[in-house]
Curated annotation (Swiss-Prot):
Keywords: Amino-acid biosynthesis, ATP-binding, Cytoplasm, Histidine biosynthesis, Hydrolase, Nucleotide-binding. It catalyses: 1-(5-phospho-beta-D-ribosyl)-ATP + H2O = 1-(5-phospho-beta-D-ribosyl)-5'-AMP + diphosphate + H(+). It comes from Bordetella pertussis (strain Tohama I / ATCC BAA-589 / NCTC 13251). Belongs to the PRA-PH family. The keyword Cytoplasm applies. GO terms for biological process: L-histidine biosynthetic process. It is an enzyme of class 3 (hydrolase). GO terms for cellular component: cytoplasm. Pathway: Amino-acid biosynthesis; L-histidine biosynthesis; L-histidine from 5-phospho-alpha-D-ribose 1-diphosphate: step 2/9. One of its GO terms (molecular function) is ATP binding. The keyword Transmembrane helix does not apply. InterPro entries: HisE, PRib-ATP_PPHydrolase-like. It holds the Pfam family PRA-PH. This is Phosphoribosyl-ATP pyrophosphatase.
Length: 115
């Protein structure tokens, strides 16, 4: 698996754009939906993640491929907003997926630290 670069990966490009919407980067909540989400407490974007996840579940339950794609895109977008808030990047998530690649789900779960 290759590591995507900011120049050729859509997730990286979106993350770059989202970073410009952060309040400390001058993002204007009056003119940007993302800046508005990021200027509020995390509950604002966390609520959207929950809503989009529920909509994805409903689309999948109904077996509607176009809606599944659309709702997945909405969910991923709001997850990218959350990553931006916490100063994380999609590459961090992709690296974790790469680390897990080839492991059985049970093996991967057993390797996780216990809380």
């Amino acid at each position: 698996m290759t590591t995507p670069t900011a120049g050729d990966d859509i997730l990286s490009r979106i993350a770059d754009t989202l970073a410009t919407r952060r309040p400390e980067a001058g993002g204007d909540p009056q003119s940007s939906y993302v800046a508005k989400l990021l200027s509020k407490a995390p509950d604002a974007f966390l609520k959207k993640i929950g809503e989009e996840a529920t909509e994805l579940v409903m689309a999948a339950k109904d077996g509607q491929p176009d809606r599944i794609i659309s709702e997945t895109a909405d969910l991923w977008f709001h997850c990218l907003v959350a990553l931006t808030h916490y100063n994380l990047r999609p590459e961090d998530v992709l690296a974790e997926l790469a680390r897990r690649e080839g492991l059985s789900g049970l093996e991967e779960k057993a390797r996780r630290p216990r809380d």
